[in-house]
Amino acid sequence: MGGRDLAGLPSRVERFIGGDLGQVEQIFRQELDSQNPYVADIFAHVAHFRGKRLRPMLLLLAASATGPINEAHRVLGAVVEMIHTATLVHDDVLDEAETRRYVATVNARWNNETSVLFGDYLFTHAFHLASSLDTTLACRLIGRATNIVCEGELTQTRERGNLDLSEDAYLRIIDGKTAELCAVSCYLGAHYADADETVAKSLEQYGRTLGIAFQISDDLLDILGSEDQTGKSLGTDFKKQKLTLPLIRLLSQTEEPEAQRLRELLTQADDEAWAEVVRWLHRSDAVEYARNRALEFAAAARSHLECLSNSAAKQMLVEITEFATQRSY
């Protein structure tokens, strides 16, 4: 594994499915084209921070690994990207984030009201586009997945400041808010390639466990990453008192009287407290523990690919599990 060029993986995936990914992008832009100059200006801005396009990539790779890519896949790739982008726009409001992908967030450039409404605009367009397919299956599955994403975000909001949050509860939250959309992307890719239902379900589980590995890694980057590399505001989880896996582990391994001091720091949520918490993290096994858990979920994701025949698409799905836990952005 170690000799692979994982940093160049996104570019290699783009070259492999480039024509189809380009058509996904075209459908995405056509669906969101607006004659309203204000809306068009917001969309042009959002296009700059849409990121890795992981979910449409997963959908297209799942399709390529199980059968030919067709027009339904390209439409669905645009749909899942719209859903994901909507969640980013709304997340930035919840986190009061100021930058994403090196540019100002919608809430920073305009205001929270504009962010909420534009996120809603993306959601409605996603379902409008999904309804253009011949059957209602995709619309129903994506609707269900979006409901689960929202439930995950609502649960995380409810649990802010809960210093007794368990690892199991944390995993349930990220399973909903992050992994669900990866799972449905992979399932739809396989299903619309006429894959056997058993294979489609295996790819769904691949997407789910991969999504969990990605989110744990994201949570580590929020603590240890560099804003120059990630291109987004960091430390937002701490400032919003959202307990993530490294902090859950640190709390579970800290005994009194130190535990009381740690809890005080976690409730202060300012820069000085954050600097001290980071020092605590580095003195503990919390970072290593979280990394190992991410690696475990990545390995579980790879195991769900065993049902696939060898192909370039399968190999890229394997490498994405490695990229998920080794990336710096």
Predicted regions and their residues:
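All-alpha prenyltransferase/terpene-synthase fold signal
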Residues: M1-Y329
